[in-house]
Amino acid sequence: MAPQLLLCLILTFLWSLPEAESNVFLKSNVANRFLQRTKRANSIFEEIRPGNIERECVEEKCSKEEAREVFQDNEKTEAFWTVYVDGDQCLSNPCHYRGTCKDGIGSYTCTCLPGYEGKNCEHVVVKSCRLFNGNCWHFCKTVQNDTQCSCAEGYRLGVDGFSCIAEGDFSCGRIIKSRNKREASLPDFHFSDDYDAIDENNLVETVQSQSATLLKKSDNPSPDIRIVSGLDCKLGECPWQAVLIDEHGKAFGGGTILSPYFVLTAAHCLNQTKSIAVVVGQVDISRKETRHLLHVDKAYMHSKYVRATYDHDIAILRLRTPIQFSENVVPACLPTADFADEVLMKQDFGIVSGFGRLHERGSTSDILKVIRVPYVDRYTCMLSSNYRITPSMFCAGYGNQPQDACQGDSGGPHITAYGDTHFITGIISWGEGCGRKGKYGIYTKVSNFIPWIKTIMRRNQPSTESSTGRL
């Protein structure tokens, strides 16, 4: 009896299965009345429907143009797209010290707060003089992760710790507008019988070319070379300009006023005449009746000067009587070596002045000329010359314009302005012709000789120095 009952139960279960399936699963025509989905591809109304980022880019893969149609904004599209393509790189917050992260495709960019740098803003920036000269008006020095400003002689540091305040009426490097147009009559000129080339404990000596090591590539550079196509320098606009006068009363070179007793010039100028006098404060040297000649007491030539190649072409003249400063006579400031190399010589232009030839084969000028000359990078400088450009030299000029220093300008100033202060950066030395295409003027690099200049001036300072001077 039991087997028969079990068989009946099995048959009953099998008979009920189709009915159970029909109760659970609806037929397709019935199901479609409840479940409907609009087809995406090739829909007739697809292009006229308003953009929807979920429909466009979530339900299916979209292009950047489709995303742009949704946002109608390039910036929002870029922000979405960088995350959509490969995820948000900024989710891990990779930027340190509260830096702001911006996602990119396969990368990210951190915008750091002031004082931090690096890909992830991970480096604390030490205050550096290389950044805007530490905001210093003159000289900058890094001290224990901070910057310390200082000023040229004749200036004091302002209370803000950055500015430099002139202490006198004629502090160095200042161009002062003259109110007095009258020039007083000055004594007749008189020449010193001679001047001495002093050996200052091996700091200076007269160098014979035959004993020097020649550094040239071929023949010697043009002697006494070094304004062509310059503008007239008005009275008071080049107040540091000195003119060298020979024993015949003729101008033959230039110099830069450093203090009441000292004038900077080129070493090769010392070989041009038996005696030297200096004139300052003039822009027209044809007016000999207004000249006041300052007699050279001693001349200090750099001990490493090479006459054949103009290497170390620098000298200092000490005057018997001091220069009287005025609106038209002001010394140039002497920079520190670091300030000259890292700040001044990275400016676009320097200023060159002189009474030299107006063109290569022309006559010298009675009127002081001035030009702006751009600094030339060292590689271009070396390629342009047939002669070796030593570390004590630099190039300035246009290369493709006839504006240059020329014969008779030798020893004159190359000045660079920083703010309202003018610093001596070079000495007109030599060149291959004047204003030739592809050629530049060669200048003695003053920053290489700052310790030498200061030593000469300190050791040979007259005890009767005028109080108007600035060393």
From Swiss-Prot:
Its EC number is 3.4.21.6. It is found in: Secreted. Pfam families: EGF (PF00008), FXa_inhibition (PF14670), Gla (PF00594), Trypsin (PF00089). GO terms for cellular component: extracellular region; extracellular space. Residues 21-40, 182-226 form a propeptide. Residues 86-122, 129-164 form the EGF-like domain. Expressed by the venom gland. Glycans are attached at residues 92, 271. Belongs to the peptidase S1 family. Snake venom subfamily. Is classified in the group D of snake venom prothrombin activators, since it requires the mammalian factor Va for maximal activity for the cleavage of prothrombin. This is Venom prothrombin activator vestarin-D2. It comes from Demansia vestigiata (Lesser black whip snake).
